[in-house]
Amino acid sequence: MASPEILAPQPPPPPQPRYTVFRGPNGIRAGWRVLIFLALVAGIGLTIGLLVGVIVALRGSAGARPSFGVSGLTPLGLSLSEGSLLLLTAVAAWIMSLIEHRPWGDYGLPVRSAFGKDFWIGTFGGFLAISASLAGIFLFRGFRITGVATHGSTLAMAIAAWTGTFILVGLAEEFAFRGYLQYTLTAGIGFWPAAILTSLLFGVAHAGNPGESKAGLLSVVLFGLLFCFFLRRTGNLWWAVGFHAGWDWGQTFFYGVSDSGIPPYHNFLNSAFRGPQWLTGGTVGPEASVFTPVVLVIVAVLFSRFYRENRYLMPTSAARPQVSDLKPQTFDLGPQA
C-alpha cells in the first residue's frame, strides 16, 4: 500500500510590506529623499549666511560688499562660490547617509579612489578635448593665439591657483548634480531618466551666466550626459571630476578664452576669435561653438571603447521572499499497515 504523505503544519505567511506615498521598497521614496536633501542644503546655506551676516555686522561693515579689484573670472572668487557649493552638498549628503545607513562614498566620491588613475586620465582627456575644439575652430580660421599673458613668478602662482580652483570646480559641480541627486533619482526612476533630469538641471544652473546662449546651454546639457556616462562606466565620479577640471583649466587658464561669457584673469595665453558665432561661440566662448558637441560625441565613442563594462552599482532594495516561493514541506512516515 502506498505510503501517504502528511503535510506538516505551515507557519502563517509573513506579513506583506505596507507601502505608502512616503515609503516604498527602499524605505523613504526617492522623491522625498531628494526634497529632504535639498531642504538640508538650503537650511545649511541659510544658517551659514546668517552667521556670516552677524559677523560682518558686528565688525561694523554690514553694508560692505567684497571687492577683489578686478572684473572677470578669478581663482579667489570662483573658489569661494564653488567651495561653498561643495560644503553645502557634502554636509547634506553626509546627513542623508546617516539617515539611509549608507557609506558616504556610495554617492559618487569614494575616498579610496580619490585622485587616482581615473582622475588623472580624465584630467588629461578634458584638456585634450578643449584643445581639439579650439583646433577645429583654428582650422576654419576662427581662432588664433596672440601671445603670452603671464610670466615669471606670477605665472607660477597662477598655475597653482587655477589648478586648485578647477579641481574644486570639478568636485563641487559633479557632486552637486551627479552625486547624491543622481544616486537617489536612479533608485526611483532608473539611471538614464535620472541622468537626463540632472543634466537639464545642470543646464538651468548655467542659464544665469552672463552672455550665455542657447547653443552654450545645449553644450552644458551634453556635458552633463557625458559626465553621467563616465559615472555609469567607471562606477564613481572621479573620471568626470578630472575631465571637468581639465576642460575648464585648459579653456580658462591655458588658452585664456571666455567661459560662459566671463573673461579670465591671470591666464597663460592671450587668444582671439574671428568669424561667425556658430564657429567661434561668440561672446560665450568655445563651449557655444559647433565643434564642442562634435568633440563631446567623439569623446563618448572613444571612452566607450576603453571602458566597456558598466560599473555603477544600481541602488536596489533587499530581496524579499514571496509567498509563492514558500513551498509546503512534506514528511514521509514510511510504510503504513
For each predicted feature, which ranges?
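N-terminal, membrane-interfacial amphipathic/helix-forming hydrophobic leader that caps
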Residues: M1-W104, G108, T252-A337
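Membrane-interface helix/loop boundary segments of multi-pass membrane proteins
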Residues: Q16, A172-L197, F229-N236
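Juxtamembrane helix-loop-helix connectors linking adjacent transmembrane helices
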Residues: V52-L80, L98-F175, Q182-A187, T316, ...
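Small-polar-interrupted transmembrane alpha-helices in polytopic inner-membrane proteins
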Residues: I130-S131, W162, F166-I167, G190-A207, ...
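Membrane-interface helix caps and helix-loop-helix hairpins in membrane proteins
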Residues: V148, A205-K214
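Functionally important transmembrane alpha-helices
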Residues: G216-Q277
